[in-house]
Amino acid sequence: MRISAELLQDWRNRALRLEEEVGKAILGQQETIRLINVALFARGHVLLEGDVGVGKTTILRAFARAVGGDFERVEGTVDLMPGDLIYHTYVDAGGTPRIEPGPLLRHGERLTTFFFNEINRARPQVQSLLLRAMAERSVSAFNREYRFPFMSVFADRNRVEKEETFELASAARDRFMFELRMPTPSETGVRRALVFNPDYHDVDALLERVTAEVIPWRDLNDISAAIQR
């Protein structure tokens, strides 16, 4: 894709619109919104840190809605295995074993936002699989390769509890474009609104404020490559 001044201006306007839409659901996190937006257009991944309740999941769901495509969330636990990201096995009502696609595969190429909550609770083998998927935007399973070229990975770490956690190695952390600290809002007006305004107590209603798919997400890779030239 050749980039022109008009195209660049058009995408700048789209990026600003994206921030504006996310801001409809999020208060007091303008810097975090801007940096996630930068990572999105640079096709980088983000490691988030922040206290419980600062809105990490909400901000990612807002971005996922504004960007379009599909959102997936996985909880890091000590008993999570690499295969759990790929497939899910169960026995149906008739007693027949079944295999269904796991969180990495079930959306196909529509997967745009993948959130791994508390990544340092997952075993190193699980972390390694995720890091490979981040680097290659693909995984191999069932004798074939599955690709998700539009996926952006976001993860956060539990910084409070140390038991049954597996800290990310420096090489693994390098796979993330940014390590962002989401602060607790300090402005009095923002804190008051978050506590006392009932609009901010219903996340699903908040997300309805965000206009869906304000950018053509299938073009993100092309525009990112064009910008970096």
Where are these regions (language model features)?
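Pre-Walker A (pre-P-loop) alpha-helix and adjacent loop at the N terminus of AAA/AAA+ ATPase modules
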Residues: L8-D51
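Conserved NTP-binding/hydrolysis module of P-loop NTPases
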Residues: L80-T96
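Short beta-strand-centered segment that lines the nucleotide-binding/catalytic pocket of NTP-utilizing
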Residues: D70-G83, F142-R147
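Short loop/turn elements that form and flank the Walker-type P-loop nucleotide-binding site
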Residues: R34, F41-R43, V67, G108-R110, ...
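Canonical AAA+ ATPase core
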Residues: D92-G95, E118-L129, M134-I215, N221-A226
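Conserved alpha-helical scaffold flanking the Walker A/P-loop in AAA+ ATPase domains
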Residues: L35-V38, D92-F115
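Walker A/P-loop
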Residues: N37-V78, Y90
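Hydrophobic anchor at the beta1->P-loop junction of P-loop NTPases
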Residues: L48, F115-F116
